[in-house]
UniProtKB/Swiss-Prot annotation:
It is found in: Cell membrane. Disulfide bonds: none annotated. This is Membrane protein insertase YidC. Residues 290-310 are annotated as: Disordered. Keywords: Cell membrane, Chaperone, Membrane, Protein transport, Transmembrane, Transmembrane helix, Transport. GO terms for biological process: protein insertion into membrane; protein transport. It comes from the Bacteria. GO terms for cellular component: plasma membrane. Belongs to the OXA1/ALB3/YidC family. Type 1 subfamily. It is a multi-pass membrane protein. It comes from Tropheryma whipplei (strain Twist) (Whipple's bacillus). NCBIfam families: PRK01315.1, yidC_oxa1_cterm. The lineage of its organism: Bacteria, Bacillati, Actinomycetota, Actinomycetes, Micrococcales. Its main location: membrane. InterPro entries: YidC/ALB3/OXA1/COX18 (IPR001708), YidC/Oxa/ALB_C (IPR028055), YidC_ALB_C (IPR047196).
Length: 310
């Protein structure tokens, strides 16, 4: 049963892995023209960053849809809270069904979809697993399903960041080697730790400084906002697990993707904030200052004779 499921997932990821390899090789070739060596670990690391740029740029329309969905959820949050208060303490099946029906009706009328905000993450997961398998395949056999084959696949496998950190190495691999008294790569552990720290710092900055500015005051007591605060504590724990377990190449991808998300959120909130939020008021002040400068009445020059008569 599990073998069949594994083969099914492998078949789904096959075209994704092929596309990932094409993008990696494209950026690796481009960086080669710019003076990076064929076996340079930095070249392959930057190629992974290039993969992030391509994937996230492709998902910009989905991100904009996510922003609209989040805004809709915040707009209807007071109505959802009223329904929850209406059925508070009622645990019978009929009451729960009635509550769900009323909430679904609000979602339908207002055009909101609670699942739309998860779409960018869901669409990135196949790329994440595809890249993981590309790195694993390169480590085990030096062969891929696309252009990462033959000598190029060997170069990808043998590349080292700073000359010592393989893309397929992980913190956990060297940590267990250290515990067993075997040879381990301290630089890999340091690089993995730094990348994990950057991931957590960027995520905390986004959750604490960027997103709260875009939440209206009347929505801060809703379950939607409380769920976001829960994620504030869960995501760093998840990132710690990722930093411990996943290869350095995956950590590069996820760190670059987190930085992209933070910048994208900040730009979207700056240009199109939610009504009633702090970011919205700041934008109004910015526009008000600009309007005062541009809409001021032009004073006509007065010649000397007219000035003397006055």
């Amino acid at each position: 049963m599990f073998d069949g499921l594994f083969d099914f997932l492998q078949n789904i990821l096959l075209p994704i892995k092929w596309v990932i390899e094409q993008i990696l090789v494209f950026f690796h070739t481009l960086l080669g023209f710019l003076g990076f060596g064929d076996k340079s670990g930095l070249s392959w690391a930057l190629s992974i960053v290039g993969l992030v740029i391509v994937i996230r740029a492709t998902l910009i329309p989905v991100f904009l849809k996510q922003i609209r969905a989040q805004r809709k959820m915040l707009e209807i949050a007071p109505e959802v809270r009223r329904i929850q208060e209406k059925y508070k303490g009622k645990r019978d099946v009929l009451s729960r069904q009635s509550m769900n029906q009323e909430m679904m009706e609000i979602y339908r009328v207002r055009g909101a979809n609670p699942l739309s905000s998860c779409l960018p993450i869901v669409l990135q997961m196949p790329v994440f697993f595809g890249l993981y398998q590309v790195i694993e395949s390169a480590q085990n056999a030096g062969t891929g399903v696309g252009p990462l084959n033959g000598p190029l696949g060997m170069d990808f496998r043998d590349s080292r960041i700073f000359g010592v950190v393989p893309l397929h190495d992980s913190f956990s691999h060297d940590f267990y080697a250290l515990q067993a008294g075997q040879a381990f790569n301290l630089i890999t552990m340091i690089v993995a730790g730094v990348l994990t720290a950057i991931m957590i710092a960027v995520q905390l900055f986004t959750q604490l400084k960027v997103i709260p500015k875009n939440i209206p005051e009347n929505a801060k007591n809703t379950s939607v906002y409380k769920n976001q605060k829960v994620m504030l504590y869960l995501l760093p724990i998840m990132f710690l697990g990722m930093g411990f377990s996943f290869p350095v190449g995956i950590l590069i991808y996820w760190t670059a993707s987190n930085v992209w998300s933070a910048v994208q959120q900040a730009v979207a909130i700056y240009r199109n904030p939610s009504p009633g939020s702090l970011a919205f008021e700041l934008r109004r002040k910015r526009l008000g200052v600009q309007n005062k400068k541009t809409k001021g009445q032009r004073q006509q020059p007065v010649n000397k004779r007219r000035a003397k008569r006055r």
